[in-house]
Amino acid sequence: MELLDKLTILADAAKYDAACTSSGLDRAGRPSGLGSTLAAGCCHSFSADGRCISLLKVLLTNRCVYDCAYCVNRRSSDVRRAAFTPRELAELTIGFYRRNYIEGLFLSSAVWGGPDRTTEAMIEALRLLREEYGFRGYIHAKAIPGADPLLTRRLGLLADRLSVNIELPSEESLGRLAPDKAKAAILAPMAQIRDGIQASRGELARFRHAPRFAPAGQSTQMIIGATPESDRHILTLTQALYDKYKLKRVFYSAYMPVSNHRLLPAPQSFRPPLLREHRLYQADWLLRFYHFRAEELLDEAHPNFNPLVDPKCSWALNHPEFFPVEVNRADYEALLRVPGIGVTSARRILVARRCAPLTFAGLKKLGVVLKRAQYFLTCGGKYLEGLRVSPDGVLRHLVAQERPMLAQGAPEQLSLFEQTG
């Protein structure tokens, strides 16, 4: 099979994998090396549906011994199959990088011949890139559950970020749709990677040139919409993953119908839950940067997010006792809870109010989004002049602000091969 045919098949087979961000790394270039994650390395470029397109996102092979119902590459799927040799993949990546098509590599693979054999092939491809071609750019590799821990260790020494897909939000759903996989087999490498990263950081603190293990951390991805779990269940799982496994990111992938399996939504009537995916990402942001907890955002009475407003606004509307916040006296944590105030603008407020009392005009200059924040804060004990605040009125105004986004059509995945313009 021609190399271009392999690339066409294996790039298309990888398009449903969302966990390909490249932030959080500072691997510097060397005179004898190629690429860098500083000046010329991992510039972020995202397609309309939020997926990173700055990396060559490809599978080593789409031949698989597993038969997961939700996966386009499952054993029983009638699709064209292909596989790169490690040398082919390394040469392809270097060629694309030299032509400035990509800033790095995102490498995953179906499991062919067992987890160990698949991981060994991935390791060889990355070894060629790092050692033979001197590639210093960003590499994100998918660790294969069930592989020998020593192989996972070797993979992490060659890659900048590792990830292990948790696949589905519950053990019950995993057993129904992916009977060849087990929760314990997925969580074991996540724990190993966590421990390896912590050990590596300790070694680097003592020895400057100690080998770095997955220096950009680890992430995971789960499919939403294929199974009946609520947003509360998903967000509680996310919180636990961040707390226990120290993940950098949890990615959410709206289920795309690829199968007529009886346990999955019927493709004819199913619409991918892209808005739900968006709300989960917004809530995830609140967990990571705004010091919210999953149990604060959703509860038994409200197990799913309101699709009409973002999670932060929804929380604010459900907790009127917290508001209004007086911007000239509130601490940092209270400011973060105000819709329209972000991490940067909250810090600016703390600095600016040392010099003089803040006004609404001043807040706008500091980057506060007043069209949302005005309903939840006061300056000098007063709301914005002329503003009338009532729960129903605030909700209507917030929904009106979201309406342009709610009316957008479903985004499409960009293609490497189709002609544009």
Model-derived regions, located:
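Short, flexible active-site-proximal loops enriched in glycine and acidic residues
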Residues: 65-67, 83, 96-106
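Conserved, mostly hydrophobic/aromatic
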Residues: 55, 68, 107, 164, ...
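Residue-level signature of tetratricopeptide-repeat
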Residues: 352-353
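Long, highly charged, low-complexity intrinsically disordered interaction regions
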Residues: 263-336, 372-421
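Flexible, acidic/Gly-rich N-terminal and inter-domain linker regions that tether
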Residues: 1-63, 369, 377-378, 382-408, ...
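Conserved AdoMet/S-adenosylmethionine-binding subsite of the radical SAM
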Residues: 90, 95, 113-297
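Canonical Radical SAM [4Fe-4S] cluster-binding loop centered on the CxxxCxxC motif
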Residues: 58-87
